[in-house]
Amino acid sequence: MKIYDRNRNVLTLGQRVMIAATGALDVLKEAHTDNLTPYEAEHEKCVLLANSRERYAPIELIRLG
């Protein structure tokens, strides 16, 4: 399933992103969207970043480049 950042840009694995709340830069590592509706996939904390131990909702991220 496609996931979108807060600006409605498609997010893909390996892509650089910025965490909107902190401005920290990271790389999208995994997205666990199995059995989620499109709304849930956008708002649930289902994204893992390479250098962070937390999960993020795609709507909390901004795609870079």
Where is each model-derived feature located?
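Mixed-charge, Lys/Arg-rich low-complexity intrinsically disordered regions
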Residues: 1-16
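Basic/aromatic-rich interaction segments and small domains that mediate binding to polyanionic partners
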Residues: 16-59
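Short hydrophobic/aromatic patches at helix-to-coil boundaries
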Residues: 62-65
